[in-house]
Amino acid sequence: MTALANIRNFSIIAHIDHGKSTLADRFIQMCGALQDREMQAQVLDSMDIERERGITIKAQSVTLYYDHPNGERYQLNFIDTPGHVDFSYEVSRSLAACEGALLVVDAAQGVEAQSVANCYTAVDQGLEVMAVLNKIDLPQVEPERVIQEIEDIIGIDAVDAPRVSAKSGLGVDKLLEALVEFIPAPTGDRDAPLQALIIDSWFDNYLGVVSLVRVRQGTIKKGDKLYIKSTKDAHLVGSIGVFTPKPLDTGILEAGEVGFIIAGIKDIAGAPVGDTITHASTPDVDRIPGFKQITPQVYAGMFPVESTDFEKFREALQKLQINDASLFFEPDTSDALGFGFRCGFLGMLHMEIIQERLEREYDLDLITTAPSVIYEIVKKDGSIIYVDNPSRLPEPNNIEEFREPIARCQILVPQDYLGNVMTLCIERRGVQVDMRFMGRQVQLIFDIPMGEVVMDFFDRLKSVSRGFASLDYNFERYQVDKLVKVDVLINGDKVDALAMIVHETQSRYRGNALVTKMKELIPRQMFDVAIQAAIGSQIIGRSTVKAMRKDVLAKCYGGDVSRKKKLLSKQKAGKKRMKQVGNVEIPQEAFLAVLQVD
């Protein structure tokens, strides 16, 4: 049992690639939580995708025991959080369990937009934020400039910020000492009725639902009967403990501590994230104010290639949803693709990762349609509807006003690339709101249509600024504009999954570019294939895929039968990823061609 005064709960927040996960590895190593032979890079990034891409997607918690030079032993509960803008909701959830946060800034690159956004989130939640300069052993570091930037842009005192190298471990011991002094101990009465917050939940095939909780007051023991406020269900605690980073069963969690609970909950919705847990004997305890519900920004249709996989796909989405509260889905049908789901995501990276996890972890073959944002439509009769799928748009003569979502974008960019970035924002129909010079960096604030931001704006921003610009955005408002729906017809049949909503001024260009792109992607058939783009009944672009006869065995002559079988099976595998539309086969790439039309 650790006294409250000796517990420290904190998160690590930073921009992508500023060294959060590496610093977490050093903490684990220095506190002796893992043997040297068990150490590996990114210990806390448990998903294969996280390791391959070198990013953190899920926040992970670890309990470490640190022996301070003053002779005291401290329990450090720390949570490693994601840095990418798509996963900022994970950060706000983690911060709800902490009293303090370490803001890790790369001493060579300086402050970036996501650090600013996450830092403001921490300050809003009443946390103490401590700046840390990382990568101090690089030859190109400029600590004085970066300290000035932290003070100018974020507004926290950074003169005494610890300087560390998470890679080599330099200065990390001093950081641990400073952290214990700086971050306040938690408060809470261990004898009061139980009140605990669910920070995260995930599904384990053997144990059921595993919940990560922060105990605000009271004590949870093995065998206790717990009451979950929102579902009003009671469950018996089977196992309780902390991650060190391996699960360690301690049998008890007390006020101020962060740990896991397994209570044999089999229903996926049985332990919602952000909910409050108490004892079944005291069900009237107040709910802890949770986190704000996040709303998806991007919607896309996902359809199984094999229609028999539909139920398997539904189960996979339900299991992912418990672990990822921001994933939204509802059943959807498409004339071209059959039955599937309309899914909502926080951004393009989030969408890619969900698709990759579905294909890897649940062995599904999926076709994804081009993503779209939510539009607000005022109909002629005055009613307002929200449309996230171009194919569900009312007829043009029934629309009074077409409103698109606008994102408030905060961009930090070195002065050298300011011109390029402003040109890009204006190309994307952006309107400048503010511009501030802060040392070598410039803070730009633009209002840009959300549809332009979520597609490939982030990638383009990185390329025009050679990777130096950084972006944070959030939804600002709906605004009236001249938007039209462009349909794609293949041999005269509309393909609902290829429809897109674009600005009137770009409609002809985008329609023609899409038709040309589709011509490259649709394989030649036994007959001519006409591809047309249309607004209403007016055709704005056309191209034709010429007919051919495709014979994969033509070059085999006599040959061995196994060689012929190999060629035929290769052709069959290619066809599996295609769907019949009328009488034309369309590959997956064609459904995403909408994205590549620039």
Swiss-Prot record:
Residue ranges constituting the tr-type G domain according to the UniProt record: 5-187
One cellular component term from this protein's GO annotations in UniProt: plasma membrane
Positions that bind GTP: 17-22, 134-137
Domain of life: Bacteria
Family: Belongs to the TRAFAC class translation factor GTPase superfamily. Classic translation factor GTPase family. LepA subfamily.
Function: Required for accurate and efficient protein synthesis under certain stress conditions. May act as a fidelity factor of the translation reaction, by catalyzing a one-codon backward translocation of tRNAs on improperly translocated ribosomes. Back-translocation proceeds from a post-translocation (POST) complex to a pre-translocation (PRE) complex, thus giving elongation factor G a second chance to translocate the tRNAs correctly. Binds to ribosomes in a GTP-dependent manner.
Identification of the protein by name: Elongation factor 4
The species this protein was found in: Psychrobacter cryohalolentis (strain ATCC BAA-1226 / DSM 17306 / VKM B-2378 / K5)
